[in-house]
């Protein structure tokens, strides 16, 4: 069985209720760390990315679509890269990372992006 590794990690700024990030759309906020990972890892063939899985609890309003897919596009990743949004409430991000690792370990994927995006408005 293939091993899965976390090769890089980044997070968005920590905000507070009604703070400076309250007006930032969920997909725009999620695209920031994705774009930064792409820039920091320029030698990676991002066209070979199998999927991007992001946790997002309680999608509503502007969040009421596939936030992961929108973040992939906003981050400038190739249009061929899919995105899957996982909703497990508080465990969404953990489930997204676990699912990405399982895809790699089972041989269904070779390169995955996974994480979470939360926003307290």
Question: What spans do the regions from the language model cover?
Answer:
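Conserved catalytic cysteine-centered active-site region
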Residues: 24, 56-110
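Short glycine-rich phosphate-binding loop at a beta-alpha junction
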Residues: 47-55
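Conserved small/polar residues in nucleotide/adenosyl-binding loops
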Residues: 118-121
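General beta-strand structural signal in soluble alpha/beta enzymes
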Residues: 6-7, 54, 82, 113-115
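Signal peptide-proximal N-terminal region
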Residues: 35-48, 76-79
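Condensing-enzyme catalytic core mediating Claisen C-C bond formation in acyl metabolism
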Residues: 1-24, 36
